[in-house]
């Protein structure tokens, strides 16, 4: 970034904004980069502004019981705000004086009185000087107010961010992501955009008072006729505005529905393609779009009437003000034109400026109140610790995640009893719930320094809550906690901040080369780092998207290990690691490198428990056991059932099995309706009322609004029947921060969350606490990662044994903080946060306009119709002007009654009726023509938007994954949210305004030129100057606007990133560093926004200066050349004054149109994406009139017999090579193997080796080469849909879209209810579905939040069974599954897919034991493909990965394999039909 010329600019340069010329020149000649932007001044820096406002806010908090944020803002910005307001008022006053001079010019102008001619010249000079003074006053004032609005926004942005980092976990659980994004984006933007209008709340009334006084001199009491009409018009506009808001609120819900489905489709596009659901998703979205467009049209029509009322009101204002006075008393020409000029100013003040000002104050005060409520929320309290303590002690600790839940649930129960549930069981959800259950109860233990405590327990036992309580995130209600307070923390879900790998590991702690290299080696990161060209300096984007889940987990662990702390809290750090890597890291890092440190490790692995000094097993929030492993074996022989979360499943009765599975439901609806409305059309306030606000009370158990995917702590496990808890506010089972959703489930789009968030997230109750405990990026295989291999490279760490070194002894007792803020440059933020820079021209090309016009054939005819109407209007005006002298001046030449011809009365008894009829006729004609011109235009433009959305949706659904993989989810979603909103809302009315204004200007210029041809000579260079100046400015302004838009991304991304890692930030004490990083992101955006405001004001001022020159020329040409009296001069000068404001408005509208057309360019870019089948985008869907079939029927030349393909499921893979992107590295190279029909194959390999990639390649979801055959049919010989239908898929990222159970299982409606129920019963879903009101018609929302992860897996199984697939692909199906559901899935696989080919990628060893063959992937190739016997007998990855105990489990398979046929090798011990039946849900 460069030094700003503003620092050395002169007063004149600042007044005329000439200091912006260098950036304008550079932007016109070349593409602007971030390095071309100027540094901001210290007065605009986020540090200074936030410190100033924070100081005043703290003062307000300390001095008053009811602090007001408006008072703090007033003390910071009031005097500058009022100073610019006074300057703005003086500029507006000149508008009221201009008509007086105009009237005097007309009055003094008389061809018979040559003496008065010199007065007219001087008055003309005065009139021109007024325009110059107004220009010099108005633009600095508007710029100053915009500048103050920007500073207020920056200060409040920073204040909100700092407050967010201080909020308690309880408060974060009550705030949705949509609320935070809305607070920062929608609310605070009002200060940027609206502060310049705020002063008109007092300027407009003063101006109206002044104008009414001046008009009283001319028209007396008739003045109030025009004012009354304007007031009625303003009230009518207010009513239309209210009606428009009503339609927009209704439409917001429909937009919400569409965007939620679209978001789910985009985030799960691989699953959509794998299931061949493209047409089904298109039909669902288009149906929602159709309903949305009906409301869009209604809102657009009302808004059009509101806008057009301003344009046509001028006729009636003059009609009601002048004609009654003229008919009764007669009127002179001077009064007519003076009144018209006054009415133009009066109309703007009453119908535009004052309503806008009132709305600005209303919105701004509402935003300030919301922010004020937010700033007073409860903060995180740092517990006081004993710094001399070296051990960890807990004494009788009890804790609750929520307080006051008893009253809430009692009310919820009462509300539920008053409703009717379809199954008739009103007590279903509350039968055995005990209120106010603690998450931890009476916890006591002690750990000596240097010991390893292993914490185990079932899902929801309170393990993570225990760590949170030690960290101070969960405040104990009883008991004491003692430790030194020097904590390091590794969360269960790895958190990666934007920056380099090195920055993520060091994390602000002082750098020690020896320690750093040792940690890298112990966490098995050497090999991964060596594969990056920049090594550990490679920049990781948002959430570490370029890394695999295992790599992210190891970096998070390395961060925790690198810090020199007294206590290390490790929350399930091995969740995403393969068995071999986990084993190595546990030995080298946990047991050796950290041998002298106190460690608390949350784990469920028996090997870890054996090596722990102490073991703490939690069950239902209480201590089940505390002691050593040997004591555990002696005292608690049944500990394995508590560790796994259940007793032996086969020991339960069928009734008890059903009860246990039912208890896994953590969300349920209180509504009795079969369909649920899950959209919020209004954003909730931050105001906390009552217990937690009415919204919280009403939605505490609602599956609609609460999507916190936490498990819960059981109060009484084995004695309870029915449903035991709910997630958002469980009663006897409280929060355990272990998500039951799949790790890859996206919570927010990966980029630009902000631009689309407020639109579609408002109706999805996503708490911030859930964001902190889940991952928004795919924790599985990364699409951009380097391939990880198991080959060990030369160690970068010291070669001594890790058990013999102490990496912490080289430092002081406590690491010093490393000040990184000075090392971070604003330009580096682009690598960390920015989306891909869009390759769109600086100015919208003519090709885009032409293509937009030709999208719909009707648009061309409508534009021609507008031109025809315009010509009729101009012709009518010219006819009136031609008749004007004959009618209005025919009596004047013969009149001798007038004492002074310059004040001759032009209204006579013979001409009054003619005037009345002509004026009314012309006014009505122009009004009717104007309405007929505008409505078809708006209607057609919305139709064009509908067509473009349809084409873009088709393109995305048909685009190959290799193309979609290069795009960010947020970028795609922005096309369907922000850009479609522009096409629907802004573009039609903006184009209408531009066309209307342009035609008004052209018409006025034509009329003036006809009256005075010399003026046409002055018009030509002025129009040319306008066009050239606009083109010159647009090149720079659009680039600055693009940079400003990109600059917003770091702000909101950093906010979301900080929230995800908030517990880590607090544990490491890195809040100041992240505040500094946030301020740098704010400063980066400020630099772009301030420069855009400055260049915009430079352009506006030049436009007005050009017009002032034009007006001077028109004035003196009229005065010096006109010799026929005051009538012609009055018309010319009045039209010229009107042209000034209208032309400037038209130019601004043209810039807005060009800016909005960039959205059209982006949409066209998506429409032009290639398709999977290589056909043009307009050829892969039926015509508009034809209805898409519910079933995709594809003819296959290889399958024209009576045989069903595939029949056996035999697969042959030959030389398969796979890439994620066209230009990317090959993830798999020359893979060849074959699978026999009905065989089960397990995929083995380290994290990131390409197992999931191989499954995607089978589905042709990647850029592949080679050949795959299924039952002899090659994938090149049939279509994609036919090929993919051969597979059943259970992906790592389970896809449940918002819709009914029926739609999720059968989106095309192919199967009857009887067939669906049969399959649901077969896979164990029947009892789950029957628990919900409406059963198959129950609406699932937000990714199926009412279902556990296991139930979602069963949904995928059911889809595969319904598809009659012969080949089943399973990608990590047991990840984060509770043991119950895992056992059911195993049994279902055995029964429902007994004759199918199964390909399984799995880290859990027991799940792999059922496979007959194993495919080992290493270094992008197949390293080994053998049977179990060969794998165990040779030194292989599989043999290294499994423990001796697991090898014993395989002995029956190995021994029996010599006696049994291949088809029975993988079969488990046969069960009777009765036993199998009992295991079903």
Curated annotation (Swiss-Prot):
<feature type="transmembrane region" description="Helical; Name=9">
    <location>
        <begin position="991"/>
        <end position="1011"/>
    </location>
</feature>
<feature type="transmembrane region" description="Discontinuously helical; Name=8">
    <location>
        <begin position="919"/>
        <end position="939"/>
    </location>
</feature>
<dbReference type="Pfam" id="PF00664">
    <property type="entry name" value="ABC_membrane"/>
</dbReference>
<feature type="topological domain" description="Cytoplasmic">
    <location>
        <begin position="940"/>
        <end position="990"/>
    </location>
</feature>
<dbReference type="GO" id="GO:0048240">
    <property type="term" value="P:sperm capacitation"/>
</dbReference>
<feature type="topological domain" description="Extracellular">
    <location>
        <begin position="1117"/>
        <end position="1130"/>
    </location>
</feature>
<feature type="topological domain" description="Extracellular">
    <location>
        <begin position="1012"/>
        <end position="1013"/>
    </location>
</feature>
<dbReference type="GO" id="GO:0005769">
    <property type="term" value="C:early endosome"/>
</dbReference>
<feature type="topological domain" description="Extracellular">
    <location>
        <begin position="880"/>
        <end position="918"/>
    </location>
</feature>
<feature type="binding site">
    <location>
        <begin position="1245"/>
        <end position="1252"/>
    </location>
    <ligand>
        <name>ATP 2</name>
    </ligand>
</feature>
<feature type="topological domain" description="Cytoplasmic">
    <location>
        <begin position="244"/>
        <end position="298"/>
    </location>
</feature>
<dbReference type="GO" id="GO:0060081">
    <property type="term" value="P:membrane hyperpolarization"/>
</dbReference>
<dbReference type="GO" id="GO:0035377">
    <property type="term" value="P:transepithelial water transport"/>
</dbReference>
<dbReference type="GO" id="GO:0005634">
    <property type="term" value="C:nucleus"/>
</dbReference>
<feature type="modified residue" description="Phosphoserine; by PKA">
    <location>
        <position position="767"/>
    </location>
</feature>
<comment type="function">
    <text>Epithelial ion channel that plays an important role in the regulation of epithelial ion and water transport and fluid homeostasis. Mediates the transport of chloride ions across the cell membrane. Possesses an intrinsic ATPase activity and utilizes ATP to gate its channel; the passive flow of anions through the channel is gated by cycles of ATP binding and hydrolysis by the ATP-binding domains. The ion channel is also permeable to HCO(3)(-); selectivity depends on the extracellular chloride concentration.</text>
</comment>
<dbReference type="GO" id="GO:0005524">
    <property type="term" value="F:ATP binding"/>
</dbReference>
<dbReference type="InterPro" id="IPR036640">
    <property type="entry name" value="ABC1_TM_sf"/>
</dbReference>
<dbReference type="GO" id="GO:0016324">
    <property type="term" value="C:apical plasma membrane"/>
</dbReference>
<feature type="topological domain" description="Cytoplasmic">
    <location>
        <begin position="1152"/>
        <end position="1481"/>
    </location>
</feature>
<feature type="transmembrane region" description="Helical; Name=6">
    <location>
        <begin position="340"/>
        <end position="358"/>
    </location>
</feature>
<dbReference type="InterPro" id="IPR050173">
    <property type="entry name" value="ABC_transporter_C-like"/>
</dbReference>
<keyword id="KW-0472">Membrane</keyword>
<feature type="domain" description="ABC transporter 2">
    <location>
        <begin position="1211"/>
        <end position="1444"/>
    </location>
</feature>
<feature type="modified residue" description="Phosphoserine; by PKA">
    <location>
        <position position="813"/>
    </location>
</feature>
<feature type="topological domain" description="Cytoplasmic">
    <location>
        <begin position="1"/>
        <end position="77"/>
    </location>
</feature>
<feature type="region of interest" description="Interaction with GORASP2">
    <location>
        <begin position="1387"/>
        <end position="1481"/>
    </location>
</feature>
<feature type="modified residue" description="Phosphoserine">
    <location>
        <position position="548"/>
    </location>
</feature>
<feature type="transmembrane region" description="Helical; Name=5">
    <location>
        <begin position="299"/>
        <end position="319"/>
    </location>
</feature>
<feature type="modified residue" description="Phosphoserine; by PKA">
    <location>
        <position position="669"/>
    </location>
</feature>
<dbReference type="Pfam" id="PF14396">
    <property type="entry name" value="CFTR_R"/>
</dbReference>
<dbReference type="InterPro" id="IPR011527">
    <property type="entry name" value="ABC1_TM_dom"/>
</dbReference>
<feature type="transmembrane region" description="Helical; Name=3">
    <location>
        <begin position="196"/>
        <end position="216"/>
    </location>
</feature>
<keyword id="KW-0868">Chloride</keyword>
<keyword id="KW-0564">Palmitate</keyword>
<keyword id="KW-1017">Isopeptide bond</keyword>
<keyword id="KW-0539">Nucleus</keyword>
<dbReference type="GO" id="GO:0016887">
    <property type="term" value="F:ATP hydrolysis activity"/>
</dbReference>
<dbReference type="GO" id="GO:0015108">
    <property type="term" value="F:chloride transmembrane transporter activity"/>
</dbReference>
<keyword id="KW-0406">Ion transport</keyword>
<feature type="topological domain" description="Extracellular">
    <location>
        <begin position="99"/>
        <end position="122"/>
    </location>
</feature>
<feature type="glycosylation site" description="N-linked (GlcNAc...) asparagine">
    <location>
        <position position="894"/>
    </location>
</feature>
């Amino acid at each position: 970034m460069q030094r700003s010329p503003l620092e050395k600019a002169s007063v004149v340069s600042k007044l005329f904004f000439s200091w912006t010329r260098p950036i304008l020149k550079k932007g016109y000649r070349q593409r602007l980069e971030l390095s071309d932007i100027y540094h901001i001044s210290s007065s605009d820096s986020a540090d200074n502004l936030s410190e100033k406002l924070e100081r005043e806010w703290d003062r307000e908090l300390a001095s008053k019981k009811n602090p007001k944020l408006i008072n703090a803002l007033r003390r910071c910005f009031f005097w500058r705000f009022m100073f610019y307001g006074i300057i703005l008022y003086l500029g507006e006053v000149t508008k009221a004086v201009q008509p007086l001079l105009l009237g005097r010019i007309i009055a003094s102008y008389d061809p018979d009185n040559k003496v008065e001619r010199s007065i007219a010249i001087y008055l003309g000079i005065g009139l021109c000087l007024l325009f110059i003074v107004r220009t010099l006053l108005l633009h600095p004032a508007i710029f100053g107010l915009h500048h103050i609005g920007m500073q207020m926004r920056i200060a409040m942005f920073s204040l909100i961010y700092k407050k967010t980092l201080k909020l308690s976990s309880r408060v974060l659980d009550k705030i949705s992501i949509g609320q935070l994004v809305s607070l920062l984006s929608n609310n605070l933007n009002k200060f940027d955009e609206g502060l310049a209008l705020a002063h008109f709340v007092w300027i407009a009334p003063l101006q109206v008072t002044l104008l009414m006084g001046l008009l009283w001199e001319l028209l007396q009491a008739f003045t109030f006729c025009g004012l009354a009409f304007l007031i009625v018009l303003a009230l009518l506009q207010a009513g239309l505005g209210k009606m428009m808001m009503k339609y927009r609120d209704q439409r917001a819900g429909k937009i919400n529905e569409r965007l939620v489905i679209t978001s789910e489709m985009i985030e799960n596009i691989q699953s959509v393609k794998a299931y061949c659901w493209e047409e089904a998703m298109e039909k669902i979205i288009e149906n929602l779009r159709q309903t949305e467009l009906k409301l869009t049209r209604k809102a657009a029509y009302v808004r059009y009437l509101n806008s057009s009322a301003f344009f046509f009101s001028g006729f009636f204002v003059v009609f009601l003000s002048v004609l009654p006075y003229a008919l009764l008393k007669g009127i002179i020409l001077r009064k007519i034109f003076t009144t018209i000029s006054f009415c133009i100013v009066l109309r703007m003040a009453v119908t535009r400026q004052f309503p806008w000002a009132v709305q600005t104050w209303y919105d701004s005060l509402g935003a300030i109140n919301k922010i004020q409520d937010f700033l007073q929320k409860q903060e995180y309290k740092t517990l006081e610790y004993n710094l001399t303590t070296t051990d960890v002690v807990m004494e009788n600790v009890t804790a609750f995640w929520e307080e006051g839940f008893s009253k809430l649930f009692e009310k919820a129960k009462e509300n539920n009893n008053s409703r009717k549930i379809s199954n008739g069981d009103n007590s279903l959800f509350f039968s055995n719930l005990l209120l106010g259950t603690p998450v931890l109860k009476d916890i006591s233990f002690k750990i000596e320094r240097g010991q390893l405590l292993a914490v185990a327990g079932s899902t929801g036992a309170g393990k993570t809550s225990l760590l949170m309580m030690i960290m101070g995130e969960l405040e104990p209600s009883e008991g004491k906690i003692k430790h030194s307070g020097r904590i390091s923390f590794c969360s269960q879900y790895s958190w990666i901040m934007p920056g380099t790998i090195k920055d993520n590991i060091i994390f602000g702690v002082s750098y020690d080369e020896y320690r750093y290299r040792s940690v890298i080696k112990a966490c098995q990161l050497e090999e991964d780092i060596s594969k990056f060209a920049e090594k550990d300096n490679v920049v990781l984007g948002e959430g570490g998207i370029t890394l695999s889940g295992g790599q992210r987990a190891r970096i998070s662990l390395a961060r925790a290990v690198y810090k020199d702390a007294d206590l290390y809290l490790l929350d399930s750090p091995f969740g995403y690691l393969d068995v071999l890597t986990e084993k190595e890291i546990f030995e080298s890092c946990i047991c050796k490198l950290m041998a002298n440190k106190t460690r608390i490790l949350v784990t469920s692995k028996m090997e870890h428990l054996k090596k722990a000094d102490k073991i703490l097993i939690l069950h239902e929030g209480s201590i089940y056991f505390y002691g050593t492993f040997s004591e555990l074996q002696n005292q608690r022989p049944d500990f394995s059932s508590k560790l796994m979360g259940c007793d032996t499943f086969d020991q339960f009765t069928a009734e008890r099995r059903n009860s246990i599975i039912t208890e896994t439901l953590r969300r349920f609806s209180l509504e009795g309706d079969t369909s649920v409305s899950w959209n919020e059309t209004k954003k909730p306030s931050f105001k906390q009322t009552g217990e937690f606000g009415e919204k919280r009370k009403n939605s505490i158990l609602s599956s609609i609004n609460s999507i916190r995917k936490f498990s819960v702590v059981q109060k009484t496990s084995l004695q309870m029947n029915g449903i035991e808890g709910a997630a958002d506010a469980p009663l006897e089972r409280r929060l355990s921060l272990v998500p039951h959703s799949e790790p890859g489930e996206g919570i927010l789009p990966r980029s630009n969350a902000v631009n689309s968030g407020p639109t579609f997230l408002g109706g999805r109750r996503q708490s911030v606490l859930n964001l902190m405990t889940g991952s928004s990026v795919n924790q599985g295989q990364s699409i951009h990662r380097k391939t990880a291999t198991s080959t060990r490279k030369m160690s970068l760490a010291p070669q001594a044994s890790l058990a013999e070194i102490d990496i912490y002894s080289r430092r002081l007792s406590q690491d010093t903080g490393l000040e990184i803020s000075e090392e971070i440059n604003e330009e580096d933020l682009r690598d960390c946060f920015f989306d891909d820079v869009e390759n769109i021209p600086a100015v919208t090309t003519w090709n885009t306009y032409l293509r937009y016009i030709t999208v719909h054939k009707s648009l061309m005819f409508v534009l021609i119709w507008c031109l025809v109407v315009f010509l009729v209007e101009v012709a009518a005006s010219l006819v009136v002007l031609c008749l004007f002298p004959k009618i209005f001046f025919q009596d004047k030449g013969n009149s001798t009654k007038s004492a002074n011809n310059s004040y001759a009365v032009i209204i006579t008894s013979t001409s009054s009726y003619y005037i009345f009829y002509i004026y009314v006729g012309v006014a009505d004609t122009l009004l009717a023509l104007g309405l007929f011109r505008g409505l078809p235009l708006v209607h057609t433009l919305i139709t064009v938007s509908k067509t473009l959305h349809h084409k873009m949706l088709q393109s995305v659904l048909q685009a190959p994954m290799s193309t979609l993989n290069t795009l960010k989810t947020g970028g795609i979603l922005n096309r369907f949210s922000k850009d479609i909103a522009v096409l629907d809302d802004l573009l039609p009315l903006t184009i209408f305004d531009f066309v209307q204004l342009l035609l008004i200007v052209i018409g006025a210029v034509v009329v003036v030129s006809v009256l005075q041809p010399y003026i046409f000579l002055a018009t030509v260079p002025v129009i040319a100057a306008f066009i050239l100046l606009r083109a010159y400015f647009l090149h720079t302004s659009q680039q600055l606007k693009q940079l400003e838009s990109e600059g917003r991304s770091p702000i909101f991304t950093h906010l979301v990133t900080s929230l995800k890692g908030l517990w880590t930030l607090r544990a490491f004490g890195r809040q100041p560093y992240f505040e500094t990083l946030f301020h740098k992101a704010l400063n980066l955006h400020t630099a772009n926004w301030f420069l855009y405001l400055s260049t915009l004001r430079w352009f506006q001022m030049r436009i007005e200066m050009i017009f002032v020159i034009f007006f001077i020329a028109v004035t003196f040409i009229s005065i010096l050349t006109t010799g026929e009296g005051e009538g012609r001069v009055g018309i010319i000068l009045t039209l010229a004054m009107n042209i000034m404001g209208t032309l400037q408005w038209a130019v601004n509208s043209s810039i807005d149109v060009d800016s909005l057309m960039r959205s059209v360019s982006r949409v066209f870019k998506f429409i032009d994406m290639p398709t999977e089948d290589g056909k043009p985008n307009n050829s892969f869907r039926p015509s508009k009139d034809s209805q898409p079939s519910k079933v995709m029927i594809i003819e296959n030349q290889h399958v024209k017999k009576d045989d069903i393909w595939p029949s056996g499921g035999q697969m042959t893979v030959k030389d398969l090579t796979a890439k994620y992107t066209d230009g990317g590295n090959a993830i798999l190279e020359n893979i060849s193997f074959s699978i026999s029909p009905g065989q089960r194959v397990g995929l083995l390999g380290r994290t990131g080796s390409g197992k999931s990639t191989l499954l995607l390649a089978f589905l042709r979801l990647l850029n592949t080469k080679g050949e795959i055959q299924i039952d002899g049919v090659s994938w090149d010989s049939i279509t994609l849909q036919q090929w993919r239908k051969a597979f059943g898929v259970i992906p790592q990222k389970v896809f449940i879209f918002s819709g009914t159970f029926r739609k999720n299982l059968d989106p095309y409606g192919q199967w009857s209810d009887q067939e669906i129920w049969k399959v649901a019963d077969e896979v164990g879903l029947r009892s789950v579905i029957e628990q919900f009101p409406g059963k198959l018609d129950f609406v699932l929302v937000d990714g199926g939040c009412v279902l556990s992860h296991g139930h979602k897996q069963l949904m995928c199984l059911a889809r595969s069974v319904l598809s009659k697939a012969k080949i089943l692909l399973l990608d990590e199906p047991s990840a984060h599954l509770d043991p119950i559901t895992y056992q059911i899935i195993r049994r279902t696989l055995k029964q429902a897919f007994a004759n199918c080919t199964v390909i399984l990628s799995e880290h859990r060893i027991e799940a792999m034991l059922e496979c007959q063959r194993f495919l080992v992937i290493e270094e992008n190739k197949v390293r080994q493909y053998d049977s179990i016997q060969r794998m165990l007998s040779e030194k292989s990855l599989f043999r290294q990965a499994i423990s001796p105990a697991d090898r014993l489990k395989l002995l029956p398979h190995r021994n029996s394999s010599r006696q049994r046929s291949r088809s029975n090798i993988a079969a488990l011990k046969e069960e009777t039909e009765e036993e199998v039946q009992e295991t079903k849900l």
